[in-house]
Design a protein with these regions (language model features):
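Extracellular structured ligand-interaction cores
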Residues: 55, 84, 109, 133-137
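Short, amphipathic alpha-helical interaction segments positioned at domain boundaries
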Residues: 129-166
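Intrinsically disordered, low-complexity acidic/Q/S/K-rich activation/interaction tracts characteristic
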Residues: 156-157, 162-191
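Short loop/turn segments at secondary-structure transitions that flank enzyme active sites
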Residues: 66, 118-120, 142-146
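Electrostatic interaction modules used in gene-expression and signaling proteins
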Residues: 179-233
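Short, solvent-exposed positions on alpha-helices
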Residues: 55-58, 97, 223
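Winged helix-turn-helix DNA-binding recognition segment
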Residues: 70-126
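Short recognition helix of helix-turn-helix/winged-helix DNA-binding domains
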Residues: 1-80, 183-203
Length: 233
């Protein structure tokens, strides 16, 4: 039987199954694994919507990472222990209530783990040689364990953004070409029908074009835009 040791939060904060899962993930970290903290932070920023992390929570995560002295996260010393006042200053003066809300969001998203002391304070105990023997604060270990997941999500988001940009470019080029062809057709009196087929005149073509364009929503996904791009092509 596997023994599971879980750290419970101080005070009125509740312990959820998601919090337990995050602690299990943190404990599963291979001791030799190392990641560049700012590379992972950038990946999380890119994948924030997929991870359900609010924009301002990223400012708090940025501040937390700045309290870790190393650029590479590895080994056991991944707990940072700034006070809320120190965190607020690093997060550009974020109000305390907002700071606490976004810290909770980071915990709920499984990006950090709370390691609360008996009195709820954040601090570290050092040995005789000055090394940290144990600390209470926020454990950054999930960032190391889930690094590949964050990078994969960021790559998916970037690929989707590129695909959306390309389909928007297709539509822009088609709109330009169609508008110029309609203008030229009207000015030059070019016939619109070949063998009795097709729209009766350029005004009808323009109406068909307008009908396609007004169906495009202001904020559209790639899946919504691709049929329009195909129709205009």
């Amino acid at each position: 039987m596997t023994r599971l040791s879980v750290t419970t939060p101080f005070g009125r904060r509740s312990l959820t199954l998601a919090h337990v899962a995050s602690q299990v993930v943190a404990k599963a970290r291979p001791p030799e694994k190392a990641v560049h903290k700012w590379n992972i932070f950038r990946a999380i920023c890119t994948a924030k919507n997929a991870l359900g992390v609010p924009e301002r929570a990223l400012a708090v995560l940025d501040a937390l990472l700045s309290f870790h002295p190393e650029t590479v996260l590895t080994g056991e010393g991944l707990i940072v222990f700034p006070s809320n006042h120190q965190l607020s200053l690093r997060a550009h003066g974020m109000p305390m209530a907002t700071l606490r809300r976004h810290l909770a969001a980071l915990v709920d998203a499984g990006l950090i783990v709370r390691r609360d002391s008996p009195n709820g304070k954040r601090y570290a105990r050092k040995g005789r040689a000055g090394e940290i023997e144990f600390a209470f604060g926020f454990d950054l270990a999930p960032l190391v364990v889930r690094a590949e997941e964050f990078e994969a999500l960021a790559a998916e988001v970037a690929a989707e953004a590129r695909a959306l940009r390309l389909v928007r470019e297709r539509i822009t080029i088609c709109r330009r070409d169609i508008a110029k062809m309609i203008a030229t057709g009207i000015e030059e009196g070019v016939p619109t029908q070949a063998g009795g087929q097709g729209p009766a005149d350029w005004a009808e073509i323009h109406q068909l074009y307008r009908g396609i364009m007004i169906r495009i929503p202001r904020i559209a996904t790639r899946q919504a835009l691709e049929p329009t791009a195909d129709e205009l092509s």
